[in-house]
């Protein structure tokens, strides 16, 4: 069976991506990153999702982005209750580049040629590292920078949610049997994973379930 490394945050998008990769016949190795995020309950959610969806392995890697700072997700900066114009304060500098690089390294060790990530259409209007151009550029870099890219079959970066709305992601996840009740999206989630219901992540998540006509399983504080 082909191997793939899937970035798993513990949120609804990455849970759906795991199921999509498995449907394509990949043996999924899930990678989560403890980067200093304030909402650490998402890593607990990642462990739940990995177990429930039967991944081959789940690895959590520590990278202290809090020591660099620059984001409301790592610093003592208030998370806004509504999105605004421009790049939001919840953008973590270079986070997706760093996470994909870690996934790339693990893929090489595993002999895997495929990496999956959950960037999507809802995100790339505000986050520069969620744009299709970024995904294509990282794939090009991966094939220039690795032994697999130079001597092997090459690396493919999959972003299957790239052009899907949150509602479409929910519908696809439900079709594939994803238990979204295990996931955490909230930027202000408490230690038990209960969501605030007010931040931008909560708003987009709720809209997704409403759009899909699916009951919202989110635990709210």
UniProtKB/Swiss-Prot annotation:
Top enzyme class, one word, equals: ligase
Binding positions (Zn(2+)):
186, 196, 199, 202
Instruction: Report any one BP term from Gene Ontology.
Output: queuosine biosynthetic process
Q: Which UniProt keywords apply?
A: ATP-binding, Ligase, Metal-binding, Nucleotide-binding, Queuosine biosynthesis, Zinc
Chain's role: Catalyzes the ATP-dependent conversion of 7-carboxy-7-deazaguanine (CDG) to 7-cyano-7-deazaguanine (preQ(0)).
Cited PANTHER family: 7-CYANO-7-DEAZAGUANINE SYNTHASE
> What note does UniProt attach to the cofactor annotation?
Binds 1 zinc ion per subunit.
Q: Which NCBIfam families match?
A: 7-cyano-7-deazaguanine synthase QueC (TIGR00364)
Pfam families named in the record? QueC (PF06508)
Lineage of the native species? Bacteria, Pseudomonadati, Pseudomonadota, Gammaproteobacteria, Lysobacterales
Q: Entry's HAMAP family?
A: QueC
Q: Which residues are noted in the entry as ATP-binding? A: 8-18
SUPFAM superfamilies referenced in this protein's UniProt entry, alphabetically = Adenine nucleotide alpha hydrolases-like
Q: What is its EC number?
A: 6.3.4.20
* Molecular function terms, GO-annotated: ATP binding; ligase activity, forming carbon-nitrogen bonds; zinc ion binding
Cofactor(s) demanded? Zn(2+)
Q: Can you tell me which family this protein belongs to?
A: Belongs to the QueC family.
Q: What is this protein called?
A: 7-cyano-7-deazaguanine synthase
Keyword Aminoacyl-tRNA synthetase on entry: no
């Amino acid at each position: 069976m082909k191997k793939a490394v899937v970035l798993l945050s513990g949120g609804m998008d990455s849970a759906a991506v795991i199921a999509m990769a498995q449907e394509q016949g990949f043996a999924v190795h899930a990678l989560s990153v403890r980067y200093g995020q304030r909402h650490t309950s998402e890593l607990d959610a990642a462990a739940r999702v990995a177990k429930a969806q039967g991944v081959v392995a789940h690895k959590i890697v520590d990278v202290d982005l809090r020591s660099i700072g620059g984001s409301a997700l790592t610093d003592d900066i208030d998370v806004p209750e509504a999105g605004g114009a421009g790049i939001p304060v919840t953008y973590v500098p270079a986070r997706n580049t760093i996470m994909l690089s870690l996934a790339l390294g693990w893929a090489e060790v595993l002999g895997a040629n495929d990496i999956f990530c959950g960037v999507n259409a809802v995100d790339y209007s505000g986050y520069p590292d969620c744009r299709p151009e970024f995904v294509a550029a990282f794939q090009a870099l991966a094939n220039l920078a690795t032994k697999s890219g130079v001597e092997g079959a090459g690396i493919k970066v999959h972003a299957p949610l790239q052009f899907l709305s949150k509602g479409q992601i929910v519908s696809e996840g439900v079709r594939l049997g994803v238990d979204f009740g295990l996931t955490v999206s909230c930027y202000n989630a408490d230690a038990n994973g209960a969501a605030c219901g007010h931040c931008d992540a909560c708003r987009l998540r709720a809209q997704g379930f409403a759009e899909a006509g699916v009951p919202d399983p989110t635990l709210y504080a």
